[in-house]
Amino acid sequence: MAHSAILRPTRGTSRSLRELAPLLGASHHGPDAAITGVALNTSSVVAGDIFVALQGLNSHGIDHLEAALEAGALAVLTDKRGASTLSSSSEIPLLVCEDPRSLLGTLASAVYGTAAEGGPRIFSVTGTNGKTSTVFLLEAMMRAMGWRTALSTTALRQVNGVEYSSTLTTPEAPDIHAMLALARESDVSGVALEVSAQALNKNRLDHVRSTVAGFTNLSHDHFEDFGTMENYLEAKAALFTKDMTDRAVVCCDTPWGVELASRMSIPVVTLAGSMDISAQWHYEITQADHERSTWNMVGPAGQVLSLSAPILGEHMVANAALAALMLISSGVEIDTLKAAMGGGTEGVPVYIPGRVEKVSQGSGPQVYVDAARSADAYEHTLETLRRLTSGAVVMVCGTSGNRDATKRPIMGKVAATLADVVIVTDDDPRKEDPAVIRAGLLEGARSVVGAKVHEIADPSEAIRFAVSLVDPGDTVVWCGPGSQSYRDIQGVHVPYSARAQARSALRDAGWTAS
């Protein structure tokens, strides 16, 4: 795939400030301007943009207006505080409103024309774990059917084969609408979006209407933002309203999925892995090894869909089943989907970066890199690898700083309960003391009687130590970094690849890496 820095439509239309002001309820000052794009930071400004200057944690966006204008911005949208810093004689085209952030979706939709009829089908996925995997599986299934596709995930964004970098689970509203506009002009048939609860709270999905919204699961996470599971579910539930989506598919493997489905005011299809759970569709794994899984899906009228994919674990199969049902709910015939997958024998042609991704080859130990950063994700990954491993399971784990600290002891306890050896290391500390983060994981891990627990701060040394412990028949899994290409240390993005480090450790130990 090709790579590009800034994701924008190439044949955009323009909207004048005089048109935009009443849409936003904003006051217009200075001359008019023809706006062709929207930017929130100076690094993403393209000539013809309106620069949106918001209040940040440490500074106001208006402080960077000069840099935005030098980059090609034609106008600025800001709040009263931002406007007050400008000279009364300023000739900069200006829109002023009370809360510019809440209007980003309205502005971007108007500028990029994404509300027009005839756009691609939009598939949005939310939940605690499995969002990224489900989006990649959706995209792979659509591509197998011959569709032009686009996706937006934590790992990357892609439109019709061109990749763009990703820094947020769900981009800001201007970036989403720019992507949808580019998808439309690229004749894309289906777009798969990863949607976080934080994005819904911050209006990033405003004026984005999904064809189908999918729910994976809900477990303890992000209490720093939501405080309780009930509040967390409420934030996710905002996606499943008449204003946001046409229909829903909900996995009921967790009680929170059952609760969400019961509250739906839109058409909903339910899915579960256990026949003990009431659902319209059920999935069952029929075959699994270190390389792939095969499963059956049975519908309410006895419909059967058999699929295969290079994924591991019941949790990943649940994601794949959810993706398939989202497509079926959008109008795709079961036979069409089945035929695209080679009748179920060839499988879903998917590569999911950093999600139980195997980096080893040959007859040596199995080594995986995963993005798990919650107790529930640890449990699913470790239980899967335990079933597939004849020898020992060695786990390297760390977690993010400046995030929910209450989950860390729980994660550590799960790790030490299910793995034979646990090595706690640094991951993505952000502005938190890495030793404090490790201490939270170690507290839980060391509470398990007889647990073999090590603390190695340097992640490169941690993975090398893990590989030194294993032999053929054993498994190493490094949970946390996934496909991330950097570590956030005191606000600085330091280039780093866990996958590259794991491969290097394997080769240096005399094993074969992928």
Question: Could you say what each language-model-derived stretch is?
Answer:
Residues 1-29, 45-50, 60-63, 143, ...:
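ATP-dependent carboxylate-amine ligase
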Residues 20, 49, 68, 107, ...:
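Residue-level signal for inorganic ion chemistry
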Residues 37-38, 72-79, 193, 248-251, ...:
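Short, hydrophobic beta-strand segments that form beta-sheet elements in well-ordered domains
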Residues 69-71, 87-89, 206-209, 239-244, ...:
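Short, conserved loop/helix-junction motifs that constitute active-site signature segments
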Residues 70, 74-80, 249-252, 394-397, ...:
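Short internal beta-strands
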Residues 82-88, 201, 210-366, 443-446, ...:
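Acidic, Mg2+-coordinating active-site environments of NTP-dependent enzymes
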Residues 103-252, 256-267, 513:
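Phosphate-binding loop of NTP-binding sites
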